[in-house]
Amino acid sequence: MKKLVWLFLLFCVGCTHQPKQAAVHITLINNSQSIEFTGLDHAIIGEISRDSVPGIWQGLIPVYQMPADTDMKNYQKPLPGVYQLKDSAVIFTPDTPFVKNQTYFVRYFKFEGGNDTWDIIKGKKKLGKTPYIDLIFKQ
Protein backbone atom coordinates (compact mmCIF):
# COMPACT_ATOMS: atom_id res chain seq x y z
CA MET A 1 0.00 0.00 0.00
CA LYS A 2 2.84 2.40 0.86
CA LYS A 3 4.41 1.74 -2.53
CA LEU A 4 1.18 2.74 -4.26
CA VAL A 5 1.03 5.99 -2.27
CA TRP A 6 4.63 6.79 -3.19
CA LEU A 7 3.96 5.91 -6.80
CA PHE A 8 0.89 8.17 -6.83
CA LEU A 9 2.85 11.05 -5.25
CA LEU A 10 5.69 10.58 -7.73
CA PHE A 11 3.16 10.66 -10.57
CA CYS A 12 1.59 13.87 -9.22
CA VAL A 13 4.96 15.60 -8.83
CA GLY A 14 6.06 14.49 -12.28
CA CYS A 15 2.97 15.96 -13.91
CA THR A 16 3.18 19.42 -12.38
CA HIS A 17 3.25 22.23 -14.90
CA GLN A 18 6.48 24.19 -15.16
CA PRO A 19 5.86 27.57 -16.79
CA LYS A 20 8.07 28.26 -19.77
CA GLN A 21 10.41 31.22 -19.27
CA ALA A 22 10.91 33.58 -22.16
CA ALA A 23 14.37 33.13 -23.66
CA VAL A 24 15.55 36.64 -24.49
CA HIS A 25 18.32 36.86 -27.07
CA ILE A 26 20.40 39.89 -27.99
CA THR A 27 22.17 40.35 -31.31
CA LEU A 28 24.39 43.17 -32.55
CA ILE A 29 23.12 44.46 -35.91
CA ASN A 30 23.84 47.35 -38.32
CA ASN A 31 27.64 46.98 -38.10
CA SER A 32 27.43 46.66 -34.30
CA GLN A 33 25.68 50.02 -33.97
CA SER A 34 22.37 48.59 -32.72
CA ILE A 35 21.09 45.73 -30.58
CA GLU A 36 18.17 43.52 -31.51
CA PHE A 37 16.16 41.91 -28.70
CA THR A 38 14.19 38.79 -29.60
CA GLY A 39 12.26 36.31 -27.50
CA LEU A 40 10.35 38.91 -25.50
CA ASP A 41 6.85 38.02 -24.34
CA HIS A 42 4.40 38.88 -27.14
CA ALA A 43 1.74 40.11 -24.70
CA ILE A 44 4.18 42.61 -23.18
CA ILE A 45 5.34 43.77 -26.63
CA GLY A 46 1.71 44.27 -27.67
CA GLU A 47 0.86 46.29 -24.58
CA ILE A 48 3.95 48.49 -24.68
CA SER A 49 3.74 49.11 -28.43
CA ARG A 50 0.35 50.76 -27.91
CA ASP A 51 1.78 53.12 -25.30
CA SER A 52 3.05 56.46 -26.58
CA VAL A 53 5.43 57.22 -23.68
CA PRO A 54 8.93 57.46 -25.23
CA GLY A 55 10.88 55.94 -22.32
CA ILE A 56 8.66 52.91 -21.71
CA TRP A 57 11.07 50.43 -23.39
CA GLN A 58 13.91 51.63 -21.19
CA GLY A 59 11.88 50.46 -18.19
CA LEU A 60 11.71 46.91 -19.56
CA ILE A 61 15.09 46.39 -21.27
CA PRO A 62 17.59 49.12 -20.37
CA VAL A 63 21.14 48.92 -21.76
CA TYR A 64 24.09 49.85 -19.54
CA GLN A 65 27.84 50.21 -19.89
CA MET A 66 29.65 47.74 -17.63
CA PRO A 67 31.75 49.61 -15.05
CA ALA A 68 35.32 48.55 -14.23
CA ASP A 69 34.11 47.57 -10.75
CA THR A 70 31.25 45.16 -11.43
CA ASP A 71 29.92 45.65 -7.90
CA MET A 72 28.85 49.13 -9.03
CA LYS A 73 26.72 47.96 -11.96
CA ASN A 74 23.47 48.48 -10.02
CA TYR A 75 24.27 52.21 -9.85
CA GLN A 76 24.82 52.82 -13.58
CA LYS A 77 22.59 55.07 -15.64
CA PRO A 78 20.97 53.51 -18.71
CA LEU A 79 22.40 54.48 -22.08
CA PRO A 80 20.19 57.00 -23.88
CA GLY A 81 18.98 55.95 -27.27
CA VAL A 82 16.09 55.04 -29.52
CA TYR A 83 13.98 51.88 -29.20
CA GLN A 84 12.10 50.69 -32.29
CA LEU A 85 9.65 47.84 -32.64
CA LYS A 86 10.19 45.74 -35.77
CA ASP A 87 7.98 42.65 -36.14
CA SER A 88 8.44 40.74 -32.87
CA ALA A 89 11.86 42.25 -32.11
CA VAL A 90 12.90 45.44 -30.36
CA ILE A 91 15.88 47.33 -31.78
CA PHE A 92 17.92 49.68 -29.59
CA THR A 93 20.26 52.24 -31.16
CA PRO A 94 22.27 54.27 -28.61
CA ASP A 95 22.77 58.02 -29.03
CA THR A 96 26.55 57.47 -29.02
CA PRO A 97 27.90 54.36 -30.80
CA PHE A 98 29.11 51.36 -28.85
CA VAL A 99 32.84 51.48 -28.07
CA LYS A 100 34.95 48.63 -29.42
CA ASN A 101 36.15 46.14 -26.74
CA GLN A 102 33.83 47.73 -24.16
CA THR A 103 31.50 45.45 -22.21
CA TYR A 104 27.82 46.31 -21.92
CA PHE A 105 24.89 44.62 -20.27
CA VAL A 106 21.15 44.53 -20.75
CA ARG A 107 18.90 44.17 -17.73
CA TYR A 108 15.72 42.33 -18.73
CA PHE A 109 12.98 42.68 -16.14
CA LYS A 110 10.73 39.62 -16.01
CA PHE A 111 7.21 40.94 -15.49
CA GLU A 112 5.44 37.83 -16.77
CA GLY A 113 4.05 35.27 -14.32
CA GLY A 114 4.87 35.00 -10.66
CA ASN A 115 1.95 37.10 -9.46
CA ASP A 116 0.64 34.36 -7.25
CA THR A 117 0.65 34.48 -3.45
CA TRP A 118 2.21 31.02 -3.38
CA ASP A 119 5.20 32.31 -5.35
CA ILE A 120 5.84 34.83 -2.58
CA ILE A 121 5.42 32.18 0.12
CA LYS A 122 7.75 29.74 -1.70
CA GLY A 123 10.36 32.48 -2.06
CA LYS A 124 10.25 32.59 -5.87
CA LYS A 125 9.26 36.24 -5.74
CA LYS A 126 9.78 38.98 -3.16
CA LEU A 127 7.36 41.81 -2.55
CA GLY A 128 8.50 45.06 -4.12
CA LYS A 129 11.25 43.36 -6.15
CA THR A 130 10.95 42.68 -9.86
CA PRO A 131 13.14 39.76 -10.92
CA TYR A 132 15.59 40.45 -13.72
CA ILE A 133 18.29 38.84 -15.82
CA ASP A 134 21.53 40.58 -16.82
CA LEU A 135 22.64 39.74 -20.36
CA ILE A 136 26.27 40.69 -20.95
CA PHE A 137 27.72 41.44 -24.39
CA LYS A 138 30.89 42.95 -25.79
CA GLN A 139 31.14 45.16 -28.85
Segment roles from a protein language model:
Residues 1-4:
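Positively charged n-region of N-terminal signal peptides that target proteins for export
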Residues 6-8:
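Sec-dependent N-terminal signal peptides
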Residues 11-14:
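C-terminal motif of bacterial Sec signal peptides marking the signal peptidase cleavage site
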Residues 17-139:
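Acidic, low-complexity Ser/Thr/Gly/Pro-rich repeat segments typical of extracellular/periplasmic
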